From Swiss-Prot:
Domain of life: Bacteria
EC number: 3.4.21.88
GO biological process terms on file: DNA repair; DNA replication; negative regulation of DNA-templated transcription; proteolysis; SOS response
Database matches in Pfam families: LexA_DNA_bind, Peptidase_S24
DNA-binding region(s), chain positions: 28-48
Protein name: LexA repressor
NCBIfam families attached to this UniProt entry: lexA (TIGR00498)
Keyword Repressor attached: yes
SUPFAM superfamilies on file: LexA/Signal peptidase, Winged helix' DNA-binding domain
Gene: lexA
CDD domains, alphabetized: S24_LexA-like
UniProt keyword annotations, A-Z: Autocatalytic cleavage, DNA damage, DNA repair, DNA replication, DNA-binding, Hydrolase, Repressor, SOS response, Transcription, Transcription regulation
Length: 215
């Protein structure tokens, strides 16, 4: 890897940890808060320096559009836009009624045209986040979580799941005898789901996040 200053290495390591933990890079504001910068502009300067050194790639206009370069095993890389690439039209899912499919027409409030650079892989829909149970993963109330429909997920991935009549966003971990749905906020309890529970259904995995007000 190109030689980095100590501060640049801190920023690079923070980006990588965020991608490994949540599936998407941090925003400039999150980098600034984590590393004690005076403002997001200071984080932007370090990101541009890293881009000039060829270790990251930045997507213009995307607050989380950061891609690590030259790392074969880096998970959840963002695909940056190429010339002529079409925008994605994604349905926004609001409240979900008990017992009905998450993409049922009555749950879709509108559609958004989104830059593919915002996502780690192609999502199927956006889900409006309610509550702060995933706050420490950078997922806040009112954010739009990009979700790819899946019936399986890996340990550590952030998932969307049905739990009884509710739809929840949590981090998945397998435990003896079942699954643990982990909240990223100490004010919220984790949820244990027994193996084979009819109350649980995986709806998809998180592949990106749009901060409220960015669209």
């Amino acid at each position: 890897m190109t030689k980095l200053t100590a501060r640049q290495q801190q920023v690079f390591d923070l980006i990588r940890r965020a991608i490994e933990r949540s599936g998407f890079p941090p925003t400039r504001a999150e980098i600034a808060a984590e590393l004690g910068f005076s403002s997001p502009n200071a984080a932007e300067e370090h990101l541009r320096a890293l881009a000039r050194k060829g270790v990251i790639e930045l997507a213009a206009g995307a607050s989380r559009g950061i891609r690590l370069l030259g790392i074969d095993d880096a998970p959840h890389q963002f695909t940056l836009p190429h010339a002529g690439l079409m925008q994605l039209s994604l349905p926004l899912v609001g409240r979900v009624a008990a017992g009905s499919p998450i993409l049922a027409q009555e749950h879709i409030s509108q559609h958004y045209a989104c830059d593919p650079a915002l996502f780690t892989s192609k999502p199927d829909y956006l889900l409006k986040v309610r509550g702060l149970s995933m706050r420490d993963a950078g997922i806040l109330d009112g954010d739009l979580l990009a979700v790819q429909k899946r019936t399986e997920a890996k340990d550590g991935q952030i998932i969307v799941a049905r739990l009884g009549d509710d739809v929840t966003v949590k981090r998945l971990m397998r435990r003896p005898g079942g699954l643990e749905l982990i909240a990223e906020n100490p004010d919220y309890e984790n949820i244990f789901v027994k193996a084979g529970s009819a109350e649980f259904a995986l709806e998809g995995i998180a592949v990106g996040l749009i901060r409220s007000g960015e669209l």
